[in-house]
Amino acid sequence: MRSSRPFPFLLSTLALTAATLSLGSAMAHAAVVEGGGDVPPVSHAPMGEVAVRRGVQGPAGLFTARIHLLVNASKNEFGKPTSLAPDFYYSLTDSVQIGLLHTLPMGWQTLPGAGLCLTGSDKGCATVYNNVGFDFMYGLFYGDVHLSFHSSLFLLRAPDPLPAGVMWTVGLSGKLHFTDAVALLFDPQIGISLKDRDAYKDMLYVPLELQLQASRAVALKLLSGVTGQLSSLGDTYQVPVGLGVVANLTPNLDLGLRFSFDNLLGKVPAVPPGLSRTDLRSLGLLLTIRS
């Protein structure tokens, strides 16, 4: 029998999101600027510093490479798999950004195995090259509330005999600035399967980052969110919890590290038999290059 819990769970999620948006708007100290033209800078600091104060898109002409090394750190499975997932972004204007992705819609919290899998089929790699995505963002608001329309098209590869998949995601990416040093990054998206819908289900992705500017060059992040199948969200939702740190080394270079419990607060059946919630873990190394 189909569970009746997804609908109340989704209502609760939407209510929490609405409350958070209202709180962020109430705490804003500067006017919100609509996108479409030149966007005023949020900081005159060198590129990469005071990153928490910045928005979700780069200024016109900025090229950014975010290179992720994703490592399974689960009990008895360390490094199985390990994958390399580079993301590339280019800002055509202050309001329009395009990208080529190898992470999935959970961003930095994408699980190991995405992108180019390095450890072989006997160590957790279903295929060598698992997914690629094409990303588009359009800035709507700037200031103490950054908000962008966000959409991606993902091509998903599966091991034989499973078919390849195509998923289109649509949502809003934004950042609520509570102070100059504290912000909440959110990027909720609905993933719609465009091919082989029996094998690939429509999905919900809600990555969240609570960001704290510890110093001009160092940002701390509390990572969480929700992901699951829309048709059975109450039975499939997963909630990761993690910590991350990103250090700005030069105006062109950042280095980051995260550690996550991949389903610390999610649905229990997602945990394989014999493992506890804390046994499912992953590491993410991040190298960011700007030019």
Features from the language model and the residues they span:
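Transmembrane beta-barrel domains of Gram-negative outer membranes and organellar outer membranes
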Residues: 29-195, 202-291
